[in-house]
């Protein structure tokens, strides 16, 4: 299936694809043993894994931005952008649970000992029992409904996992190891994720400028995922991959164990709040919106 773009006006550019309800109907048929007739429609839920402590920005989810904790900005954004999906917060501390619960959001207490957000997600879904799980990061306050719906559409297809990417526009970002790159096959499946510049431009000795980056398929991976429940449950038991351990990118575990990851492309910007400086950038974005 070829790639398609989501514009800021949320119109799809590119080949016409089956509506998401048709994909869900086909999935429902498979859940019903291939039989026609009444079937239990598979469910999709958004789960946000939340960890109180953070190395670069301690207790960042409770950091106040314009008088409101970052986690609340994220919760309200998701609820407003994608109200059609049930929303849960998988938390590891009572302070996080109380922060979302007092505002009417559902919170699930999970073990504080999880090694990754994906493990926390899997524990929470044993309570939620969704067939498809969309993972929005707790520090991504500008996620859009179009992005969430694209993830739901992709994971309802053949691949057990989906994620999003956006084109690089600046060489400095492309060369930054903190901005993860993804190489995408012609059918939309991920070929490789890396912190290194991908592709490496041999004819230029690796030297690139903004114009070159903007004109070539250089994609930044966004930390938004969707999982089929069976893969999510299996993830924790998969052996860590060699490249995962080198790059410190857990999505490589999925590829190294032979599973496909579909990649959707989006032009919507995101701001991951990893540092106090990022929090200031988000506040500036709020000011710009008025």
Q: Which residue stretches match the model-derived regions?
A:
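Conserved core of the sugar-phosphate nucleotidyltransferase
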Residues: 144-239
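Short phosphate-binding loop-to-helix
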Residues: 88, 94-153
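Hydrophobic/aromatic residues located in beta-strands of well-ordered beta-sheets
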Residues: 46, 87-89, 162, 190, ...
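N-terminal glycine-rich phosphate-binding loop and ensuing alpha1 helix
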Residues: 42-91
């Amino acid at each position: 299936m070829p790639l398609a773009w989501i514009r800021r006006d949320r119109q799809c550019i590119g080949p016409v694809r089956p509506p998401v309800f048709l994909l869900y109907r086909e999935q429902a048929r498979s859940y019903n043993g291939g039989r026609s007739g009444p079937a239990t429609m598979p469910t999709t839920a958004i789960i946000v894994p939340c960890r109180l402590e953070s190395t670069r920005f301690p207790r960042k989810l409770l950091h106040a931005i314009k008088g409101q904790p970052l986690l609340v900005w994220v919760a309200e954004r998701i609820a407003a952008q994608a109200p059609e999906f049930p929303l849960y917060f998988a938390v590891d501390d009572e302070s996080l649970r109380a922060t979302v619960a007092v505002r009417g959001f559902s919170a699930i207490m999970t073990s504080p000992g999880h090694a990754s957000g994906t493990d926390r997600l899997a524990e929470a879904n044993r309570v939620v029992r969704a067939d498809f799980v969309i993972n929005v990061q707790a520090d991504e306050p500008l996620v859009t409904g179009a992005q969430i719906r694209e993830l739901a559409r992709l994971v309802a297809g053949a691949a057990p996992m989906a994620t999003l990417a956006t084109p690089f526009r600046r060489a400095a970002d492309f060369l930054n190891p903190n901005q993860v790159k993804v190489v995408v096959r012609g059918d939309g499946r991920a070929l490789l994720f890396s912190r290194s510049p991908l592709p490496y431009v041999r004819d230029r000795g690796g030297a690139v400028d903004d114009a070159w980056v903007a004109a070539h398929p250089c994609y930044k991976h966004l930390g938004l995922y969707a999982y089929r429940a069976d893969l999510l449950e299996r993830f924790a038991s998969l052996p860590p991959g060699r490249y995962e351990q080198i790059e410190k990118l857990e999505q490589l575990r999925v590829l190294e164990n032979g599973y496909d990851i579909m990649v959707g492309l989006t032009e919507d910007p995101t701001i991951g709040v990893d540092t106090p400086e990022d929090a200031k950038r988000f506040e500036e974005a709020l000011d710009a919106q008025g």
